[in-house]
Amino acid sequence: NEARTNYEEKHNKATFVKNIISDNILPGDVYVRAKELHFVTDVPRSVYLVRQLDRSDVAALEVIQNLFPDRQRDFVLSVSETDIVVIKELTREERPEDIVAVAENIENAVRSELLVKTVIGIGTTAYHLRELADRYKEAQVAIEVGKVFDTEKSIINYENLGIGRIIYQLPTTLCEMFLSEVFKKNPIEALDPDTLETINKFFENNLNVSETSRKLYVHRNTLVYRLEKIKKITGLDLREFDHAIVFKVAMMVKKYAGSLTHISLRCTGTARCSEEIQHP
């Protein structure tokens, strides 16, 4: 009987948590239900969204569950064919790098045991049960923003999205307006792939002409000539910090605007809600 009671309580807790992150329970009811289930409401918890890429394996749920043996405090929930949510209770001593290490363990386990590639979004820490839904949405946003700006990363932390998070919330019309203002002389498409590669390397090397020319295996004067050419085409001198910032942001906005034809934007809690954006 005791084993059955524990199983039922665990099952009910998992269902309760799933209802919270899915917004299927009223905020006022969270307190009542938590009390009924003897659920501690105000401990810190991290929220991970594990998305299987290329192919999904139903065994992924069990593989991840095995990493979290404390079934009363940690919850591993299947929310779709490809998505699994992990909600882990934290101690006060855990640092940001410890939270990322958990995601790395999940990624490694799924890859080594099932040969399945994943991308993992991490929301900010929830300090109360009622915050779980927002933290789950943050993990979703982390993955969506990562798909645009951090394609090489498999673990994306919402806290580290930086300017990408701001750009992600811009409406299409504002993106287009900004790009037309920045590139008054010529559109960004006027820059060929080699020129764009030069620009990216210049940014990677902190606008250092000597270091960039070394990385590109070109003479310093050749790089200066290219930068002058960019200035002539765009009106922006990338050697000037303010111009470089404007250009960098414009490149990110352009990348984001291009992605709007095929990505689904989800609610961020404060941003706009779920809508599939299609451009003609």
Task: List the model feature ranges, each with a label.
Residues N1-N19:
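Short, charged amphipathic alpha-helical surface segments
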Residues K13, N24-V47, R51-P280:
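Cytosolic nucleotide-utilizing catalytic cores of signal-transduction proteins
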